[in-house]
Amino acid sequence: MTKISLNKLIAVASIVLTAGCGGSNSQSLNKEEKTSIPPKPPAISLFNASAKGDLDAVKQHIAAGTDLNQLDPNEQGSKDSCLGVAAAFGHKDVAIALIDAGADIGYRNKNGSSPLHIASFLCYPEITQALIDKGADRNARDNNGGTALDVMILPWDQVKGVYDFINGLIYKPLGVPLDYERIKSTRSEIVKILRS
């Protein structure tokens, strides 16, 4: 090959490579963006992922545009939302991800309890604070007429029976019994958050 032919070949190759990396590439990126397929949700339902504390699956559901306000599919269940069940099991990161993604913070289950009622009663300060920071109604009343604060200011001996009931009905059968010491020691912190 002659020196001129080699130079021409290098010049042509440079033009082709430059053209391949130039404006037409950005057009193809735009074309790809327009035709990109949204991510698929994971196999686990959002409700079950929220109940189990599976943050990765919850984030996948959020990215896929899954309805964040799905309810407990169990006909005999409390009809809690994904956020309510995450709060009930103290899955802080899941609850905060759902709150930040726009889950309904004012939803009421069949007992009239909102996620704020649930998080505060079960003494999860970070979830309680995140709900208040997002604008949860502190004055929302459950079906018994109580606000989250009303229940929290009752003496322990008056509410322990309720904890015993839900512990026996829900938590112990699932192998995650309530931590009474954590709850008792955190009640005053929850009251401060609710009053702030």
Each PLM stretch: what is its role?
Residues 19-20:
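C-terminal motif of bacterial Sec signal peptides marking the signal peptidase cleavage site
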Residues 39-48, 71-82, 108-114, 141-153:
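Ankyrin-repeat boundary/"N-cap" motif
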Residues 48-53, 85-91, 118-124, 151-161, ...:
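Ankyrin repeat A-helix N-terminal signature
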Residues 2-10:
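Bacterial N-terminal signal peptides that target proteins for export
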Residues 23-32:
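Bacterial Sec signal peptide processing site at the extreme N-terminus
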Residues 138-196:
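Ankyrin repeat (ANK) tandem arrays and their immediately adjacent linkers/low-complexity segments
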Residues 54-62, 91-100, 124-132, 158-168, ...:
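Ankyrin repeat structural motif
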